[in-house]
A protein has these predicted regions:
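Hydrophobic alpha-helical interface/terminus motif in multipass membrane transporters
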Residues: 30, 40-43, 75, 105, ...
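Short cytosolic juxtamembrane segments of multi-pass membrane proteins
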Residues: 194-200
Length: 200
């Protein structure tokens, strides 16, 4: 009578998909608007400022994440927990926890050559080793500690707990605190790096 693997896997994939979508949305499209098409520079010729651009871009990524994770969640009809739909919010927050700091990083780059390394050595290992496919408790102790520090782990755990109806208030608060903290730090960094990239 253990948990079916599909029930374990699906919420983890939901959160991990949010991470992957956000990572893409925060790299090439942002680089294009900063350096290739200079859309952001054109926007600064209007009454809006850098803060409006950064917050607006992050909000738009959030809307896209909400839509894509909602579609993915539609395939998870087997979850009957009354709070299972909140897993969509967890996946969206997971994505935003990557979008904000990656946007900040992208604004420091002169070209897209570093993005392959970001995906290969950052996003892919996080996708594989943050609890999406198997419990992080199966990792060596050092890697467990590393996993627990990542927003992916907290997003996956939060989405899974909500989807399965086993979330506890302390657990939810810990996971939310990490995700919101990373979003806030990433947003603060993005405001600085975007200003440096866009204001000459």
């Amino acid at each position: 009578g253990g948990l079916p693997y599909a029930a374990f896997l699906a919420p983890g994939l939901l959160a991990a998909q949010g991470m992957q979508s956000a990572a893409f949305e925060s790299t090439y499209p942002i680089m294009a608007r900063i350096a290739w098409t200079r859309v952001y520079a054109a926007m600064l010729a209007t009454p809006i400022g850098v803060r409006d651009i950064v917050v607006g871009q992050l909000a738009w990524i959030g809307v896209r994440l909400l839509l894509t994770t909602s579609v993915f969640f539609g395939t998870m009809v087997a979850f009957r927990s009354p709070v299972a739909a909140l897993a969509v919010g967890a996946a969206t927050l997971t994505g935003l926890a990557f979008a904000a700091p990656i946007m900040a990083f992208t604004a420091t780059q002169r070209n897209d050559q570093s993005f392959n390394a970001l995906f290969r050595f950052g996003i892919t290992p996080l996708f594989l080793f943050s609890g999406t496919f198997f419990p992080v408790e199966q990792l060596p102790a050092v890697l467990q500690a590393v996993a627990w520090l990542t927003p992916t782990y907290h997003g996956v755990a939060l989405a899974r707990d909500l989807a399965l109806g086993v979330a506890t208030v302390p657990g939810v608060l810990v996971h939310l605190s990490v995700l919101v903290g990373v979003i806030g730090a990433g947003l603060a960094a993005a405001l600085v790096t975007f200003r440096r990239a866009l204001v000459v």
